[in-house]
């Protein structure tokens, strides 16, 4: 093995905690089988990583509206992230977004995320007197593939995103 380094052990403990899968992470040092050796025992307490959200409302303009979202940042215990969001109600409001992230796709800790979406937002333009002069919908439909890798500084990442998106204005 390697010589024990308390600073490296604390950093490893912090990296495990930063994964966001555990409520608590503790390191215990036990005497090793060889003289001047230690065995490191790491104990963790898992946390709930799933999310669920729901919302509803009513307006004169749109009638009943709602939202449902489901996600998990440790999907099936693999560290993968999955999120689904669906909004409904009103004339054109049937928005959805789906994303799936694989945290490590190679030995250099590159992550990959695929996102699919179909979103419509309503906008209004106003003149200098704050009078509405135009109203329009912007529909975004597309897919994205994002690759991410940490730099030498573990708190900084580089991203590369490939997008195929249609923006439609009505």
Q: Where do the language-model regions lie?
A:
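Gram-negative/organellar outer-membrane beta-barrel architecture
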Residues: 2-170
């Amino acid at each position: 093995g390697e010589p024990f380094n308390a600073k490296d052990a604390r950093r490893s403990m912090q990296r495990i905690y930063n994964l966001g899968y555990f409520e608590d992470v503790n390191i215990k040092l036990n005497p090793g089988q060889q003289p001047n050796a230690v065995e490191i025992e790491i104990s963790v307490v898992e946390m709930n990583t799933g999310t669920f959200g729901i919302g509803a409302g009513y307006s004169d303009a749109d009638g009943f509206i709602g939202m449902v979202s489901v996600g998990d940042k440790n999907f099936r215990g693999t560290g993968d992230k999955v999120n689904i969001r669906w909004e409904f109600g009103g004339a054109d409001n049937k928005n959805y977004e789906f994303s799936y992230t694989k945290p490590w796709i190679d030995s250099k800790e590159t992550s990959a995320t695929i996102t699919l979406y179909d979103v419509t937002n309503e906008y209004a333009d106003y003149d200098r007197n704050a009078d509405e002069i135009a109203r329009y919908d912007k529909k975004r439909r597309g897919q994205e593939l994002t690759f991410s890798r940490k730099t030498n500084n573990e708190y900084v990442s580089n991203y590369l995103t490939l997008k195929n998106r249609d923006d439609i204005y009505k």
